[in-house]
Structure formats: C-alpha cells, structure tokens
Amino acid sequence: MKKQQNQGLDFIIDKLTNSIHNVVTGDSFATDISLLTASDLKNVIKKNKWQFDWRFEFKQPQRDVYKLTIVNNQSVIQGLISLEIKSDHVYMHLVESAPFNKGKTKVYAGVPGNLVAFA
C-alpha cells in the first residue's frame, strides 16, 4: 500500500473561525489572537467582571495567555485563553469571554470557539 503524504490541515471549523459576529446586527468582524501583555492585565480583573484571575495565569512560567481582539481594534479584549504546550498535547487551563460577551446580552458570538480553534 502506498503511503499518503501529510497534506496539512486545511479546513473550516465553523462559520465563525477567525471572526466573531455582532448578535444584534449580524455583522462579522475578523479577529486576531496575540499574547496578553503586562499592560493588558489592568483591564482583565475581577473588578471589571472577569471571572478568573488572569494575573495569576500570566505569571505562570509554563503557560501562555492569549487574547482575542477584533482586527483594527486591538485595545478591546473579546476573550482570553491560557495554554500550556506539552510534548504530546496542548493543555487549556482557562478560557473566558469578556464580560460583555456572556449571557443573553452578549455583544459578540463566537469568542470561545475562536480561542479553542486557535489552541
């Protein structure tokens, strides 16, 4: 039997991958995922209704915390994910949508899916 060569991954997970959409208008917005910075930490705190201690996650040397933002609007964090890269898998410690992207009044849909797809 002839061995097939690995072609890589080239598929769409869902209609929202690499974008999120406004639940009111239905408009879709392209997204970026980048590393969380120390200056970002002042905004992702429990006082601002974030559920998890992202400062703690950020300080863990074996973990990387990534933020999801809308292209051309990097100052507003839509969601966060904490990842640890192992030799045989990726461990997701935490995933959280921004407070304004939760529940019945959320602004954007697709945030967790984008973060998990990135992982």
Report the location of each language-model feature.
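Non-catalytic substrate-recognition and accessory regions of acyl/acetyltransferase enzymes
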Residues: M1-G110, N114
